[in-house]
């Protein structure tokens, strides 16, 4: 009996704990980003700068954990040559920073509903990138499945009227990076010798590039030295501590989400991530269901098409 239960778990539920964690923390982080960055809410003036702080905290956390406890894979990271480190960190960090940074900028201008609708195109870009890198072969049945998934997710948020062109362009670019992100990270990690066996070791390798790229984007695009003029975020010592606390709260959520995501990337495939990503977006939409009845978080109304999708 125990053997059959274990076999069933290994065949059908192996990724369930990490998938569940990914769904939960990703939805929570989307809500955090919308509330902190959205023009209708706190309207934090430098989303990229705050995101770079999240990456810096991830780097520090993963470094301390892997250096303190060797079971987390710190020895593997320390034994990497600089060439091997950069060959993994730079391309993976670039696509990850592009996905996350552009998504956060899009959320400044668009609703969670519209964001989810555009992000429904991500499975298509996963298939394209997986084919380009020869990880998977595109078949007719696979294309049909991907199109059905994308169409079904689109139906869940059809009816959005708050269209914003810049937000749309940012979000579609984020979807392209997202499709490349899972494929490139999986490709780099699976071909690395010796492999990075833990999510913390992987975070330690990827987060430095993500931090520096996001910081550069912030300095060029947002110009933080002038963006905070006239705001209350750093006008007093108390407000400065509150702002840093806000950043640390987001970083904590991001660490939990990325650890789950990296574990799935290491142990599964890009297409399992694709399916999980669709469910993740549905969880994000579901968190906002019933603006007047259940939750007020994202100001969404879950349409009838949600049920058509399932």
Q: Which stretches of residues belong to each language-model region?
A:
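Polytopic endomembrane small-metabolite transporters, centered on the Drug/Metabolite Transporter
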Residues: 1-310
